[in-house]
């Protein structure tokens, strides 16, 4: 009974005793969740349009951020550097389509997955060769002043990050569901050959979706880089995005943001209220335990589609 009280009663009593502190923990979790969601969005876009799990998305986040901060270090103004970084990610999409995807059409998913692993190592190595491997501070002018509302401490950077993530999700949801290009992307994901037979240009569609994923990676890189500096550990954020995808569903854009928020808030609450009771570092494994529970009881995720195949 004592163990039950310690694990399942005491933490909730602590939350009730200090609602202001609880609110700060939740807000901190929301920021982290938005950051996870931005990375997960890149995975969703490519998987939704091509059925490929792009292991290189984390490396794309790193490469986009390295390109931006590298240009700024060489004296390029912020807005010009942003524009050039977008151009670089579009060029990357063209190169990926021309030299990788075009030669792997209709191959097994595992082959495409292995190809993206190779792409991840290529981007990391090329980024290190061109821009160096040291940690680079990134400042694009996003304010980071703190202020209080109702006793709750807020940060302007957190609000900008949350607003950017929400706006990006809304734009992408409209793009996929209400535009001709978006519908073509979904058609390609369902059946490459059928899409080609009705005149949908597969090469163009893949360039578009990888370009958009690159732009999403740039936004994620800006947020993560502004918070903790642009460093090569950014590429490992892909591992944290995987539980987000499992929770939200691999094909759901809203699911990416909801899954990210659940994991971000859950991590912070678990670390603050349960960490002192059962040991620290819960933040490092909480997301994976939650993802495992979803794989056991709801493998398609909160917003994913259950796939039924007749044999």
Describe each model-derived feature in a short phrase:
Residues 1-39, 67, 75-81, 107-112, ...:
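Membrane-interfacial amphipathic/re-entrant helices at transmembrane-helix boundaries
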Residues 32, 153-233, 253-259:
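Helix-loop-helix "hairpin" substructures at the membrane interface of multi-pass membrane proteins
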Residues 36, 40, 76-87, 207-217, ...:
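Transmembrane alpha-helical segments in multi-pass inner-membrane proteins
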Residues 43, 76-119, 126, 258-263, ...:
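Alpha-helical transmembrane segments within multi-pass membrane transporters and channels
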């Amino acid at each position: 009974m004592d163990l039950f009280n310690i694990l399942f009663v005491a933490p909730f009593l602590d939350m009730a005793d200090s609602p202001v502190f609880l609110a700060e923990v939740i807000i901190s979790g929301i920021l982290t969740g938005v950051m996870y969601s931005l990375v997960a969005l890149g995975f969703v876009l490519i998987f939704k349009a091509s059925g490929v799990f792009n292991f290189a998305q984390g490396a794309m986040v790193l490469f986009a951020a390295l390109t931006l901060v590298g240009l700024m270090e060489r004296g390029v103004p912020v807005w010009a550097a942003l524009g050039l970084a977008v151009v670089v990610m579009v060029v990357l999409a063209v190169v990926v389509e021309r030299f990788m995807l075009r030669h792997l059409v209709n191959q097994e998913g595992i082959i495409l997955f292995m190809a993206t692993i190779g792409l991840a190592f290529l981007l990391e190595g090329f980024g290190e060769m061109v821009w160096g491997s040291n940690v680079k501070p990134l400042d694009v002018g996003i304010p980071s002043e703190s202020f209080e509302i109702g006793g709750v401490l807020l940060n302007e950077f957190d609000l900008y990050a949350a607003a950017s993530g929400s706006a990006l999700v809304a734009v992408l949801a409209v793009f996929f569901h209400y535009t001709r290009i978006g519908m073509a992307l979904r058609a390609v994901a369902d059946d490459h050959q059928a899409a080609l037979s009705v005149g949908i240009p597969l090469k163009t569609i893949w360039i578009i979706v990888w370009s958009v994923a690159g732009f999403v990676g740039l936004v994620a890189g800006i947020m993560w880089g502004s918070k903790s500096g642009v460093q090569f550990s950014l590429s490992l954020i892909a591992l944290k995005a995987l539980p987000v995808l499992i929770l939200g569903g691999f094909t759901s854009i809203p699911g990416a943001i909801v899954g990210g928020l659940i994991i971000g808030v859950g991590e912070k609450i678990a670390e603050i209220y349960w960490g002192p009771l059962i040991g620290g570092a819960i933040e490092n494994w909480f997301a994976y335990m939650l993802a495992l529970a979803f794989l056991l009881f709801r493998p398609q995720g909160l917003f994913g589609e259950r796939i039924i195949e007749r044999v």
